[in-house]
Amino acid sequence: MNRDMRVVRECFIDDHVRGLFQQNRLRGFADLWHLDAPWVEAPNERRKGTSGVFRYPLEAGDGAIQPVFVKRQRNHNTKTCRHPIRGIPTFLREYRYIRELQQAGIPVVDAWYYGQAVSAGVQHAILVTRALEGYVSLDQWFALDENGNDEGQVRAVLRSVVDAVKPIHARGIGHGSLYGKHIFVRTGAGATPRARPSTSA
């Protein structure tokens, strides 16, 4: 992080998560910004900025691993009524949506951290979400051979996707990136399929 970068917003979901991050030598924005891991989604260039995602394993005190997705962006903004010229980071909007939906009891990914910093007029943002264990993306699910031919299972999974997305839209929140890679499904022998969308803004 540049010396002139100033952290303007930083939120951990709770003290337990803050402690888990500190256990992994991630004290805040600067440490998260400088993490080095292979990209799950290579940085894309849109909105006159960049945005990318990587998976990172956090070590818990009991030796267990809790993977998270670290999403980083630079000058990747969206305009709002309150900020019509410079806009706000799209991750800030996504973080707010996640919190709103969770408070309404709607299952979405868990946002564990949001941070924002400014350097020479350029906005930087980080959003960390807990990886959903036991879930795969809808794209991955359809790529599995055993899922392609069972019409009943396909219908059940698609119904779970509709059931997961419907309450989001009912709250007036439009999902800006509703693709198979952003919808996570959990299925298993005899289990009712469940879907959880990410909330990419």
What residues fall within each predicted segment?
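Short N-terminal helix-initiation segments at or just after the protein's N-terminus
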Residues: 1, 69-75, 140-146
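Juxta-kinase regulatory segment immediately upstream of eukaryotic protein kinase catalytic domains
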Residues: 1-44
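Conserved ATP-binding subdomain of kinase catalytic cores across diverse folds
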Residues: 29-136, 166, 170
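Short regulatory "switch" loops immediately downstream of catalytic or recognition motifs
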Residues: 56-60, 142-144, 185-188
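Glycine-rich, flexible loop segments associated with nucleotide phosphate handling
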Residues: 64-68, 89, 151-155, 192-199
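Short glycine/proline- and charge-enriched loop/turn segments
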Residues: 76-80, 144-148, 199-201
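Conserved kinase catalytic-core helix
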Residues: 97-107, 135, 141-176, 180-181
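Catalytic activation segment of kinase domains across protein kinase-like and atypical kinase folds
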Residues: 177, 181-201
